């Protein structure tokens, strides 16, 4: 999946951001203290001469719309060969009625699809990794919130299939942990 010379770009919200300090040179700060740094550390340990470039452009609080607003500068200009996206939790509107939330989830799926189509058009050889948004049993996790995120999880799963992307089922993995 990861090839020598690849440019890996991680996009998403606070989970991806993980307190990154983008102006730092050292990966321990530049990539944040989360999964992006762990992946980078492992790759560099296992393949130190592979020439793999790793970038983190996660922004805390990002929704899909905010991600899209910065897409040209924070994705297309970087020209990734492998693009990982984790977004969706900040697109949930827990506490709204089921019909409204279903409409919001449909709009989320369409906007996400448009973003992937735009990316593929600009970067025909890019490979996608689509990560499922997830909820942890922390804070107030209501049935409405679970339902809202489940709609977006289904959307990301469908998009991964449609765009021949790797799908990362975070919710199941975390539930099984």
What are these model-derived regions, one by one?
Residues 2-29:
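Short glycine-rich His-centered loop
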Residues 2-4, 33, 38-53, 62, ...:
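Alpha-helical cap/lid subdomain in secreted, periplasmic
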């Amino acid at each position: 999946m990861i090839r020598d010379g690849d440019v890996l770009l991680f996009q998403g919200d606070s989970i991806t951001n993980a307190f990154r300090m983008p102006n730092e040179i050292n990966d321990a700060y530049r990539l944040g203290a989360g999964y992006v740094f762990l992946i980078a550390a492992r790759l560099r340990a296992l393949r130190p001469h592979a020439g793999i470039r790793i970038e983190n452009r996660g922004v805390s609080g990002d929704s899909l719309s905010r991600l899209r607003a910065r897409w040209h500068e924070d994705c297309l200009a970087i020209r990734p060969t492998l693009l990982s996206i984790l977004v969706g939790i900040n697109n949930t509107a827990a506490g709204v009625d089921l019909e409204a939330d279903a409409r919001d989830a449909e709009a989320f799926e369409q906007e996400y699809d448009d973003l992937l189509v735009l990316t593929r058009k600009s970067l025909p050889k890019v490979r996608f990794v689509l990560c499922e948004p997830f909820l942890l049993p922390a804070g107030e996790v209501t049935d409405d919130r679970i339902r809202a995120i489940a709609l977006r999880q289904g959307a990301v799963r469908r998009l991964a299939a449609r765009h021949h992307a790797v799908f990362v089922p975070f919710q199941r993995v975390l539930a099984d942990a």
